[in-house]
């Protein structure tokens, strides 16, 4: 029996945020999120019941088509995608996209980190929230940390998450944890959309803390999905 997942939307566009911004990408937005960020720009994705399901085979076929049309990466987002078990989806995507190329399509995950990792993921963007702290496993495994900034407390939280990520990697290196990443995560601060205070705080902080980089929702500025 095929695995089904609630789908808000899937589309071929450009990655607008983080280290991979500007890349051609196929997005799969899964329904369901219990994190409940007040500033969320995809609140329509929170409920699972309002979204139709699709099989992992259907999604993978669409991913393979997007790959043949130039999509360089596949991004699983939400909602909170780790509310779902992603093992079947990731495996099926790899099977379908390997037919188009010598290498399977890289799978990227955008998550708050409140649930444990499932599925074989090539790149993890951790966007932790002050009111819903991430699992230690995500702090160890993430490739980049992106914190949305609205007020000063968010900057303190961003530093706390960065420091905790480094600490967890040092611990897991000693214990040979298979999910740890030896290298430090890329660090991004992203001003809250339409937040003048967040924008100013972000700019001034990065000017004096060069380990952090600016992430903008460039897809919104361009008016694309």
Curated annotation (Swiss-Prot):
Binding-site positions, substrate: 14-16, 29, 77
Binding site for S-adenosyl-L-methionine: 79, 127-129
InterPro entries noted in UniProt: 7-CO-7-deazaguanine_synth-like (IPR024924), Aldolase_TIM (IPR013785), rSAM (IPR007197)
Keyword Transmembrane: no
GO molecular function ontology, one term from the record: magnesium ion binding
Catalytic activity entry: 6-carboxy-5,6,7,8-tetrahydropterin + H(+) = 7-carboxy-7-deazaguanine + NH4(+)
Pfam family, one: Fer4_12
Domain of life: Bacteria
A biological process term (GO) from this entry: queuosine biosynthetic process
Family, per entry: Belongs to the radical SAM superfamily. 7-carboxy-7-deazaguanine synthase family.
Assembly behavior: Homodimer.
Function (record text): Catalyzes the complex heterocyclic radical-mediated conversion of 6-carboxy-5,6,7,8-tetrahydropterin (CPH4) to 7-carboxy-7-deazaguanine (CDG), a step common to the biosynthetic pathways of all 7-deazapurine-containing compounds.
The protein's name: 7-carboxy-7-deazaguanine synthase
Organism per entry: Prochlorococcus marinus (strain SARG / CCMP1375 / SS120)
């Amino acid at each position: 029996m095929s695995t089904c997942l609630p789908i808000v939307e899937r589309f071929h566009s450009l990655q607008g945020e983080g280290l991979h911004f500007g890349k051609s990408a196929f997005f799969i937005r899964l329904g369901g999120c219990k994190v409940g960020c007040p500033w969320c720009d995809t609140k329509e994705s929170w409920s699972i019941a309002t979204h139709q399901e699709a099989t992992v085979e259907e999604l993978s076929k669409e991913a393979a088509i997007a790959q043949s049309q130039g999509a360089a990466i596949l991004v699983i987002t939400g909602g909170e995608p780790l509310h779902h078990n992603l093992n079947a989806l990731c495996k099926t995507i790899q099977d379908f996209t390997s037919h188009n190329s010598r290498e399977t399509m890289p799978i990227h995950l955008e998550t708050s980190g409140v649930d444990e990792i499932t599925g074989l993921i090539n790149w993890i963007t951790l966007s932790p929230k002050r009111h819903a702290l991430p699992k230690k496993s995500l702090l160890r495994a993430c490739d980049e940390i992106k914190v949305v900034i609205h007020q000063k407390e968010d900057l303190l939280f961003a530093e706390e998450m960065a420091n905790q990520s480094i600490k967890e990697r040092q611990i897991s290196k000693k214990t040979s944890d298979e999910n740890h990443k030896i290298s430090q995560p890329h660090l991004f601060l992203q001003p809250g959309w339409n937040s003048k205070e967040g924008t100013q705080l972000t700019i001034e902080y990065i000017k004096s803390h060069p380990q952090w980089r600016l992430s903008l929702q460039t897809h919104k500025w361009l008016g694309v999905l």
